[in-house]
């Protein structure tokens, strides 16, 4: 008698985030556009840049990098998200995979980004170490995560919508897992990286109407069991 193997945290998140990939792409991903623009500008992504978005979702950041002339790649756990990314950037190399085991060779990229992705890794230090492995020496690695949840309008919105969102995998970290001051820096140092700077970008969540807001907000993967900012140690 055989038993089904338990899905990994990455696989479980892939199923949950992929459930409403089209809604994410149409209504929600654009709320992060100011962050994409700021990061691509700071890292000077342009013609010939080898660019990887780790946790690429439906590919908006990759599409923006491609529009600047970059050679883009992306990895994500959700195949439906990757399908949208491939439509947006037919020349891109988009692969299903885990942040802790990136399916790319050493020193393959000039710039590696992770927008709202590394906080969901079961082992964020391992994921950051992988980002360092695939980045070339002297390359840039940029990790975007939410600020502290206190006072954030989005927290009240997502709290109100909790009954409409699926539960996260047992024991999985939540959206604010890397938000405590110093946590991301410490994990990056533990991964062998040398943090250079921390900067804030305002990214208002604005929707055309209530229907768009509901579809966008309910495409955001899972609810959080509690709005904790603690991260699991490596």
Language-model features: where?
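Helix-to-beta-strand junctions that scaffold the AdoMet/dcAdoMet cofactor pocket
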Residues: 121-122, 135-137
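A short acidic, Gly/Pro-enriched loop at the edge of an enzyme's catalytic core
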Residues: 100-111
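Class I SAM-dependent methyltransferase SAM/SAH-binding core
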Residues: 50-102
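C-terminal helical/coil "lid" or tail adjacent to the Rossmann-like core of SAM-dependent
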Residues: 3-6, 10, 17, 195-234
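Conserved class I S-adenosyl-L-methionine
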Residues: 2-49, 60-64, 81-84, 88
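A short SAM/SAH-binding and catalytic strip from SAM-dependent methyltransferases
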Residues: 111-124, 147
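Short glycine-centered segments of the SAM/dcSAM-binding site in methyltransferase folds
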Residues: 50, 139-140
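Conserved catalytic/acceptor-binding region of the Class I
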Residues: 125, 132, 140-208, 222-225, ...
């Amino acid at each position: 008698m055989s038993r089904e193997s338990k899905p990994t945290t990455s696989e479980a998140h892939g199923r949950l985030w992929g459930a409403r990939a089209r809604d994410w792409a149409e209504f929600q991903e654009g709320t992060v556009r100011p962050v994409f623009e700021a990061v691509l500008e700071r890292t000077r992504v342009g013609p010939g840049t080898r660019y990887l978005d780790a946790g690429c979702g439906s590919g908006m950041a990759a599409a923006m990098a491609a529009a600047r002339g970059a050679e883009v790649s992306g990895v994500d756990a959700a195949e439906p998200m990757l399908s949208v990314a491939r439509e947006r950037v037919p020349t891109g190399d988009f692969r299903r995979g885990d942040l802790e085991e990136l399916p790319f060779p050493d020193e393959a990229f000039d710039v590696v980004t992770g927008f709202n992705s590394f906080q969901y890794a079961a082992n964020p230090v391992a994921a950051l170490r992988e980002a360092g492995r695939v980045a070339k020496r002297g390359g840039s690695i940029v990790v975007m995560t939410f600020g502290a949840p206190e006072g954030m309008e989005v927290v009240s919105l997502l709290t109100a919508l909790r009954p409409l969102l699926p539960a996260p995998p047992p024991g999985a970290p939540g959206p604010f897992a890397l938000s405590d001051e110093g946590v991301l820096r410490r994990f990056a140092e533990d991964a062998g990286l040398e943090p250079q700077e921390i900067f804030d970008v305002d990214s208002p969540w604005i929707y055309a109407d209530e229907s768009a807001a509901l579809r966008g907000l309910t495409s955001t993967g899972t609810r959080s069991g509690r709005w904790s900012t603690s991260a699991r140690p490596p």
